[in-house]
């Protein structure tokens, strides 16, 4: 296993939106920063699961595509140098006798004066389609993630699911795909009422209450066989792509073994965003405190608090309250 013996000021676990803003703010406080991300790219769930979706509750943006928000955060972060480690899952964090944190991933050992974890809901994976031959079509035309709407242009697309993601993808693909069908096991969708209203007003083929029964096709799925719930009807759809939106399962995984105070799968923090371990901070959906609201906007506020207090932890002479950003950048 490789070992990076450099001791960084701040190591951030998680490269989602809150992690990226944390890295930028660490640069503003003149800290050396490292980001460790388990996925192959930065952006967290926004990039991996919802890159084409619009976000409406980020201050200053009437609406912004998820991937555009990530791109903006990466551009903002690029004002400073960071070390970025992708496809590395942190397996253990240990505070050594000298106060330096030792972080061990599946690839490398890292060292840091402080740690800020911004890992969202922890590791996540999609709920798989439980049909006998489903796995053989993964990576072909069975999709659990949609990273580019245009690859479905002119194609016949079936979507399984009844939540917000399924309905949103159906509505966004309607003007792009040749044909879109959405299949849900219940007549009533779980998605937001306004989205469901738009769905029924659209040209999307809504099939309820049906469940997938069989996938037919040699190299790729060519037909999707549906069975009516508590009924005898069957439907066979000719399709080019199948998108499964059955939600995702998240887990804190090894984080539970790091000696942190955990409450309902969240890390308990003080008003400084520090955990029960001195020098170990948390921000974003991974942490909890009285009155906590899980929003990206909330995480963007928690990130500077974590960084400024991490700076004061490393250097007691440093001010927790930073200078205004205008004074920091006006000569740059």
From Swiss-Prot:
Coiled coil regions in record: none
Annotated cofactor note: Binds 1 FAD per subunit.
Keywords carried by this UniProt record: FAD, Flavoprotein, NADP, Oxidoreductase
Superkingdom, taxonomy of origin: Bacteria
Gene3D superfamilies membership: FAD/NAD(P)-binding domain
EC annotation from Swiss-Prot or TrEMBL: 1.18.1.2
Cystine pairings recorded for this chain: none
Residues annotated to bind FAD: 37, 45, 50, 90, 124, 285, 326
Pfam name, any one: Pyr_redox_2
Family membership noted in the UniProt record: Belongs to the ferredoxin--NADP reductase type 2 family.
Quaternary context: Homodimer.
Protein name as it appears in the record: Ferredoxin--NADP reductase 2
Species the sequence originates in: Bacillus subtilis (strain 168)
